[in-house]
Structures are given as C-alpha cells and as structure tokens.
Amino acid sequence: VLLDFWASWCAPCRMVVPIVEEIADERRDIKVGKINVDEEPELANKFNIMSIPTLVVMKNGKIVQQVSGARPKKAILEML
C-alpha cells in the first residue's frame, strides 16, 4: 500500500500527484491511497504527518517506509 498525504495548496504535492497516479495505473499490484490532510486531519495525525507531501509504504498493516518531500518516480518505485 502506498499512501500519499497531500493538500491542494501545497505546490510540491501537486508535483507528486501525477507520479503517484501513474504508479497506480502501472502497478496494479499496489494499492494507492491519496489523503488530503485538510479533509482528514485525524488520519494525518494518526500517521504523525508533520509535513507534506509525505509518502507512506505499508506492508501487512505496518509502516515500512515513510518519507517527506517530493520524490521522482524512480525513488518512489524503489520504496515499493
């Protein structure tokens, strides 16, 4: 599972959105969730999101990797 924590006012988030959508289209084995931190503050708090964009990779219900800041597609794929 790849979670993308973002907000509409965040310029780096807008750079990551098309990359995450591309990965979702190409990698059907990966579930992708996009969480707007303004609309879901409780969920952002649960994941201790301090800055955005933040990408979280989960396996078997546990966080295995969490990174903040815009990342190129290659770096995101390497996280998976």
Residue positions per predicted region:
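Hydrophobic beta-strand anchors of alpha/beta hydrolase catalytic cores
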Residues: 2-3, 32, 55
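Structural motif
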Residues: 5, 34-35, 67
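Conserved redox-active cysteine motifs that mediate thiol-disulfide chemistry
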Residues: 5-19
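Conserved helix-turn-beta segment immediately C-terminal to the redox Cys motif
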Residues: 15-35, 39-41
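Short loop/turn elements that flank and shape the SAM/SAH-binding pocket of Class I
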Residues: 40-43, 74
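A short glycine-leucine-enriched loop at secondary-structure breakpoints
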Residues: 45-50
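Non-catalytic, surface beta->alpha helical segment in thiol-disulfide oxidoreductase systems
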Residues: 51, 56-80
